[in-house]
Amino acid sequence: MRSTYILIIVPLIIIGGGVVADNTNETPVLAHSSDEQPHQRLTYYNWDHKDLGTSAFEDLPPLQDQPTPLPIDQSDRCPDGWLRYSDSCYFIETESLGFAKAERKCHDKQATLFVANSMEEWDAVRDHAEKSVLSWIGLVRFSHYERLEQLPRWQTTGSINPSKINWLIKPFKPVVNGWSSYANCAASFQSPTEVESASYTFFYPCTMAFKSICERNSTILNARN
């Protein structure tokens, strides 16, 4: 019998991360420290492939090759409707989709699901996600390696330790944070309040329909292509 999953919202964290005052026709820029390092050389995990030993994803047509965007630097503007932080652009997807379709929609934008390279990036980007909803991020823990790895896996290597982000239950353990053989994918909830600990990350079945956060980063896309 399939388990029934109930979303329970409890008070957790919001960490502010303002937007630099934007001029009339400029891309919003998320505030960040000057010593922020860009993404390093990365390995990209293509979860659209069916070689991961999981039934979590829906069947989708094969991916089509996408051109790799030019590198993003501090002086570049992101596309309209995107935010910029360091060497990345971010798109807050407001359509509710299953994880696989959310990942595909990011790919169609020449992007990946959001992968945090630092806690500063994690806090700044989440602070501008849609409030009071769950958003897919590029973080999963598949059942085929559950006995070997306690931590979930970001969509690229070289990212922050997943145990450091704001899980619902800390210290991080997979099962108490919703993980099961049917709930492999992590989503982030961003509270509309400024109450400490009002936002959190939790595992859900990958077929549930949530919002999502896309990230366009030239280093990640080079690894993907």
Swiss-Prot record:
What are the disulfide bonds?
A: 106-214, 185-206
GO biological process terms on file = immune response
Positions in coiled-coil regions? none
User: What organism, scientifically named, is this protein from?
Assistant: Caenorhabditis elegans
Alphabetized, the UniProt keywords read: Disulfide bond, Glycoprotein, Lectin, Secreted, Signal
Q: Which residues form the C-type lectin domain?
A: 85-215
- Write one Pfam family the protein is assigned to: Lectin_C
- The residues that carry sugar chains are 217
Superkingdom as given in the UniProt entry? Eukaryota
**Signal sequence residues:** 1-21
The record's section on InterPro entries has:
C-type_lectin-like, C-type_lectin-like/link_sf, C-type_lectin/matrix_domain, CTDL_fold
Where is this protein localized, as stated in its record? Answer: Secreted
Main subcellular localization, coarse class? secreted
- One GO cellular component term, please give it: external side of plasma membrane
Q: Report the GO molecular function annotations.
A: carbohydrate binding; pattern recognition receptor activity
PANTHER family, alphabetized: C-TYPE LECTIN DOMAIN-CONTAINING PROTEIN 180, RH26557P
What SMART domains does the record point to?
A: CLECT (SM00034)
Gene3D superfamilies linked to this entry = Mannose-Binding Protein A, subunit A
**The protein, known as:** C-type lectin domain-containing protein 91
- PROSITE patterns given in the database record: C_TYPE_LECTIN_2 (PS50041)
